[in-house]
Amino acid sequence: MKEELHNLDILDASFPCSVFSIAGDRQKAWGKEKVFREGQKAQRLDDLAFYSIALAKELQPKVVVFENVQGLLQGEAIEYVKEIYSQMDNAGYILQHWLLNARNMGVPQNRPRVFFLGLRKDLCKPFMVQKDLFERVPKIDMDFNEKEIVLDEFSDYNGRQIPKGVMKYWEHRNEKDNSIGDIVKRMDNRLSMFNNMFLKKDKVCNTISAMEDRLLYFDNPSYISAHDTILASTFPMDYDFNGMKPWFACGMCVPPVMMANVAARIWDCWLSKIKKEECA
């Protein structure tokens, strides 16, 4: 590999989240290959984290960042987390993780995500603090308390009209309903369409999905607009998604402002001090 790659400050090596999402029977996807629409060859997704760790072990950046869905911390998936910790330790890093939510980080979207931060062991000494009775870790402040931004502060409420099959339920909504599924259960006494969530004016936008028809406005019979999808994900309105629909692109990514907040904390708490020491 090129020499400059062996002198990285941060390696962001996040891995695909679909196999760790709590939506659906995720265990069925473990150990199986998947083809992406972007054109990559068929590959397993549940072990890509370990290829990322192998890359970190080779390049030895100062800091390694992984991001994934909160489902990674639940159920049988926790075994992956244990293995990630073990392999990162072997790669020469002290690893920590936090469950963060974009809504507290200047992003107008409810998007909980797990962030793993690893600091190279030879750089840790000045930052070490006692985490608990048994563990010492490099200190970093990962508390975020930005004011929440509700839907009505930015929405144009101008998405694609919902179809008649959805409209017949939407017309019977009440303030307590959080999804079309709540109405289906009340009217038809069956479980369906709970993934079709309502967006309410005075609430933070729900998690953006890779599919347009997962979110619809409570006060307007339409799905979330491209305009709102882009702004709720903190992309510029003129961003080039390279032919992808904004719902898919935004649903598959970390909001840039969320990532910028994490990077700023890494700089403030670790890298700025390391750089200062290197220049002394």
Regions of interest found by a model, annotated:
Residues 2-8, 18-198:
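Class I S-adenosyl-L-methionine
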Residues 11-14, 52, 64, 116, ...:
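Conserved small-residue
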Residues 14, 103, 119, 209-211, ...:
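Structured loops at beta-to-helix junctions and adjacent beta-edge loops in soluble globular domains
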Residues 15-16, 61, 108, 236, ...:
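Proline-centered helix-kink/hinge sites
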Residues 159-280:
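C-terminal target-recognition/interaction regions appended to catalytic cores
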